[in-house]
Amino acid sequence: MRVNTIKKIIAAILAAVLCFGVLPSRSFFNTLSAVVKAANADSLNEAYADGTSLMPIGPAFTVDTLLSWEPTNDPDSDYSRSVVPLADRYTGFTVNDYANPDAKLMVCSLANSKHDATNAQGQESFSSYAFNYWQYATSFVYWSGSKRGQVVVPTGEFTDAAHTNGVPVMGTIFFDWGGNSSVVENFVRNYRSVADKLIEVMEYYGFDGYFFNEETAVDYTTAGNLRSMIAYMRQQKPNMLIGWYDS
C-alpha cells in the first residue's frame, strides 16, 4: 500500500465522520493508528522505490540477493561505503593500576532501529541517535534488523565515525527467535560461496566483520555448516572480526 493511498483512505474516513456525525469507536482509532504507523514505517522505502525520493537506504540481503549482488548492479551502493580507514587505537595514561589492559568491550548498539527506513547518508534531525563513548568500545556491532534479509550492512556514517575513533565495526547476520529453520539451512548449504560473498560485501563497504545472532533452532547438519562457514571465513580473512550469540 502506497503512502498516497493511505493518505486518501484517512481523508475519506475523516470526511465520513464529519458528514454523517458518526462518533468514532475505539476500534476506529486503533485502525487509524495502525494505518498511520504503517505510513510512517514504509514511507521512505516506498518513496525511494517509486523514484520520488533520492534518499538511498542502507543495504540488506537474503542469501539469494547476496549471492547475486554486484556493486555495479546497485547504482546507490557508493552511498553506504565507508571512506575512513580504521585509525590506530590511542591508549591514554593509566588511571587505575588494577585495571586489566586486556579487557575488551563489544558494543551491540541499536544503531539504526529501522534500517529499512534509514538514510544511508545520515539523518536530517538533531534528535538522531549519536553514539558518544567510542573511547570505551573495543568493537561496535551495527545492531539492526531488516525485512529485506538476514544480512544487515552498516551504513557508512557509522563505520566512518567508528573508524575515526579506532573502533572496528561488524554487520549483523540475524536469524530470529522462533524463525524458520529452512532460512538458516539455505543460508549455509553452500557456505563457501556465501562466505566469499560476505567477505566481498565487507571489503566493498569498508567494515570489519560480522556478528552472527543465531536464535533459530536448527538441526545438527545446519549447525555444523554454520561452524564450517565461520572457520572458512577465518581462514580466508584471518583479521576479520566475527562475533557470535546463540540463544
Per-region residue spans from a language model:
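Sec-dependent N-terminal signal peptides of Gram-positive bacterial secreted proteins and lipoproteins
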Residues: 8-26
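Sec-dependent signal peptide cleavage junction
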Residues: 20-41
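Positively charged n-region of N-terminal signal peptides that target proteins for export
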Residues: 1-8
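Generic short amphipathic/hydrophobic targeting helices enriched at N-termini
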Residues: 5, 13, 31-32
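Chitinase-like catalytic core of GlcNAc-active glycosidases
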Residues: 98-247
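N-terminal module-boundary/linker segments of secreted carbohydrate-active enzymes
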Residues: 38-123, 130
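A generic local structural motif
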Residues: 4, 16-17, 126-128
